[in-house]
């Protein structure tokens, strides 16, 4: 039997939001607020609302309100209350907590701070108890400048009963005069006369010979606010290093160059701390480099930040914001703006930005410890990146919705101040014939890098490719190598020279460390040289392993990232064989692709760009079943070595996929993307264009010999194994195992990238038994 609206709501206590209005209309009454509204159609609807709404204050249930009503009136009440609930115009509140020991605001304070209690009541239940908790909260405000003074005023004006201050603040020996601080004493005295006493305590002088240090100096205080000044970093960092005690909060307001920063709030179990914020801000490039140098040098030398400090209206804004933030943190009436976030204000323009703060992988307080890598089921990986449309769906208007949704998800990492990536840099670029995506990231001491990728279909796909490429750069150059918590001696070791990345030099003969890896073939755990996992890092300083991006992969999950890494490693292995003149390298005739739309489009675009492209099959299908195709320029379309293209002869790109057509598309796309940008800005070639770390540095592709006299065999629908059957990921692993080889995967991402759906790995290939020596 269907339940009536009255029966559904009879036991609830409806509480109408304070921003809801109702207005008479010719047909009844309309309920509305700033976000929308709805109409109740009834001849007496307005009078009905006038009589009923004052009783929807959460004090009584619908059943109690409807005592003595007839069935028709009860039905109207039920329909109205249900409509108010559905649209968020009202909420059901719980019955009052009358148990002993529950927090209750004293009557004088409840009368004096009725507006604050009403504000809490607008957003949350138990408003009186929430405000009583704020009133009982003991807050220590550190700092002696105008921001600290305004923070103290904000706290006591909104009902906080206990505030402790830096001794220099009331004494007038800091950035505030004694006369200016006298207004704080006057506010406290006025509240005391109204029955709302305020305790203004003075903290011990910092650096006292006999006084307690660290958190012990603030014993008894629930919230510590570092309210501005050049010494905030040197105040916050020791407290952070000691660890925020359980049940207490640390909230800083500080400056970074010409910006004022509020947050993040730190608790015993929070992630993303002041150190993370400073590291993120310092990696954004530009003026942030000088600001970071000033911050860390002032911290190391004990001189504090040398930049300008907030004053005047800006100090008042920041101080009031700090007080309001403590109010929100304690009452929970609204989500705190500094929980997992920072507020950044330009001190010249007063522009404010709120940005999410993720734990920085180099932060010693928030970096997650290394965990054992989980076995990866490579068969779960898609044959091509999941966000890409197929040729069959590309004409469909809805085909781009998947990539757009995925791009929106991953763009959470792109923020100008505290993002993993700083911004997209592809707006000025001409998006034809190929779509171009570029993303800027801070890549450690070498400064920002702009990583670019290309796509045949749409800019969303190009940006997704660029984010994946930038993620592998970030994992290599920013994320520190994970060290296992325990010893790895019990695990079998992979000899350095058995890896395809081994340079053959032998290095210094010593191993700098080991990293835990998992076999894609056997799922067993082994230990591999750390220098092979981070070939651009200090673990490979002796260049025992070739510095290359080979094996680096990124994807929406570990299987997809591992598949990308495996193809990258196979491409590098095939390229090395081709350079040595081993294996079979054959020219691919363009007509072998038939009428495949993507290859037809790309080869025609090459002619329009004035580039003559030669495609080489590097023969990888004979080894693993995958296909690796090299695209290289042999001159311009008119046959000359110079002309319309800014790319030099011998420019190259490589593609790897499960089938040869897809590999050729990847190779030609990346080669033509470079030609397209070079035709716009010639300086983008020759080192200006950054598509990620190099696969093989200083390669002159023109010197790769063609070892097969005839053209390569026509492309099959998918790469084939020895039996001629289509190859999938499982088939590739079986071929590797049959040759006595292995593929070892090491996750390289920190905790930040997976929050937006990006995982990164390094896949290491071992040599075949026949050439392991």
Regions found by a protein language model. Give the residues of each.
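Helix-biased "structured C-terminal domain" signature
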Residues: 112-114, 230, 334-773
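Adenine nucleotide-associated cytosolic modules
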Residues: 1-431, 459, 499
């Amino acid at each position: 039997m269907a339940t009536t609206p009255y029966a559904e709501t009879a036991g609830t206590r409806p509480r109408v939001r304070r921003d809801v209005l109702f207005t008479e209309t010719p047909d009844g009454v309309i309920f509305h607020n700033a976000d929308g509204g709805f109409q109740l159609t009834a001849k007496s609807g307005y009078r009905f609302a006038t009589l009923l709404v004052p009783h929807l204050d959460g004090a009584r249930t619908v059943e109690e309100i409807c005592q003595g009503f007839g069935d028709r009136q009860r039905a109207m009440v039920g329909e109205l209350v249900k409509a108010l609930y559905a649209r968020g115009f009202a909420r059901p509140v719980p019955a009052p907590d009358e148990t002993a020991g529950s927090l209750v605001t004293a009557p004088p304070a409840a009368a004096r701070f009725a507006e604050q209690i009403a504000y809490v009541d607008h957003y949350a239940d138990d408003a009186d108890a929430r405000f009583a908790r704020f009133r009982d909260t003991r807050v220590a405000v550190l700092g002696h400048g105008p921001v600290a003074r305004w923070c103290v005023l904000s706290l006591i004006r909104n009902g906080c009963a206990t505030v402790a201050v830096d001794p220099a603040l009331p004494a007038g020996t800091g950035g505030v005069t004694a006369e200016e601080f006298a207004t704080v004493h006057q506010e406290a005295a006025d509240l005391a006369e109204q029955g709302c006493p305020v305790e203004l305590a003075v903290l011990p002088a910092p650096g006292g010979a006999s006084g307690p240090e660290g958190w012990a100096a603030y014993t008894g205080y629930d919230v510590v606010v570092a309210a501005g000044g050049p010494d905030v970093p040197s105040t916050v960092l020791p407290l952070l290093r000691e660890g925020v005690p359980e049940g207490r909060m640390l909230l800083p307001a500080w400056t970074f160059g010409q910006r004022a920063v509020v947050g993040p709030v730190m608790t015993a179990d929070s992630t993303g701390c002041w150190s993370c914020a400073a590291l993120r801000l310092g990696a954004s490039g530009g003026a942030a480099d000088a600001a970071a140098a000033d911050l860390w040098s002032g911290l190391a030398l004990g001189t504090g930040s040398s930049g300008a400090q907030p004053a005047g209206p800006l100090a008042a804004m920041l101080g009031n914001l700090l007080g309001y933030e403590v109010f929100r943190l304690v009452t929970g009436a609204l989500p705190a703006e500094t929980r997992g976030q920072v507020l950044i204000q330009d001190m010249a323009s007063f522009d404010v930005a709120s940005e999410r703060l993720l734990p920085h992988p180099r932060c010693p307080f928030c970096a997650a410890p290394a965990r054992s890598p989980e076995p990866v089921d490579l068969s779960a990986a898609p044959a091509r990146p999941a966000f890409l449309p197929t040729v069959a769906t590309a004409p469909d208007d809805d085909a781009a919705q998947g990539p757009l949704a995925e791009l929106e998800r991953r763009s959470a990492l792109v923020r100008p101040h505290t993002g993993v990536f700083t911004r997209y840099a592809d707006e000025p670029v001409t998006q034809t014939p190929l779509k171009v995506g570029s993303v800027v990231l801070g890549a450690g001491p070498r400064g920002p890098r702009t990583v670019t990728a290309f796509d045949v279909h749409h800019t969303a796909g190009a940006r997704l490719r660029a984010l994946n490429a930038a993620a592998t750069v970030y994992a290599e150059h920013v994320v520190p190598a994970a060290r296992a918590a325990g010893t790895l001696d019990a695990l079998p070791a992979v000899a350095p020279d058995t890896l395809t990345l081994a340079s053959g030099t032998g290095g210094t003969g010593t191993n700098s460390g080991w990293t835990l890896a998992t076999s894609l073939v056997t799922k067993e755990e082994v230990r591999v040289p750390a220098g092979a996992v981070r070939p651009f890092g200090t673990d490979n300083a002796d260049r025992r392993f070739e510095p290359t991006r080979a094996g680096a992969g990124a994807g929406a999950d570990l299987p997809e990232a591992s598949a990308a890494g495996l193809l990258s490693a196979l491409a590098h292995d095939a390229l090395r064989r081709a350079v040595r003149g081993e294996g079979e390298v054959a020219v691919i005739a363009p007509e072998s692709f038939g009428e495949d739309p993507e290859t037809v489009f790309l080869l025609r675009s090459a002619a329009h760009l004035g580039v003559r492209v030669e495609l080489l099959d590097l023969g990888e299908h004979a080894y693993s079943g995958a296909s690796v195709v090299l695209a290289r320029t042999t001159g311009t379309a008119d046959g000359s070595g110079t002309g319309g293209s800014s790319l030099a002869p011998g420019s190259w790109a490589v593609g790897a996929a499960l089938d040869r057509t897809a590999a050729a598309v990847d190779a030609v796309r990346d080669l033509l993307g470079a030609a397209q940008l070079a035709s716009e800005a010639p300086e983008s070639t020759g080192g200006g264009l950054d598509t990620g770390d190099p696969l093989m540095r200083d390669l002159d592709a023109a010197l790769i010999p063609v070892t097969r006299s005839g053209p390569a065999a026509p492309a099959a629908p998918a790469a084939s194994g020895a039996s001629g059957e289509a190859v999938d990921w499982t088939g590739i692993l079986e071929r590797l195992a049959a040759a006595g080889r292995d593929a070892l995967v090491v996750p390289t991402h920190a905790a930040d990238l997976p929050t937006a759906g990006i995982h990164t790995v390094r896949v290491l290939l071992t040599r075949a038994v026949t050439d392991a020596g």
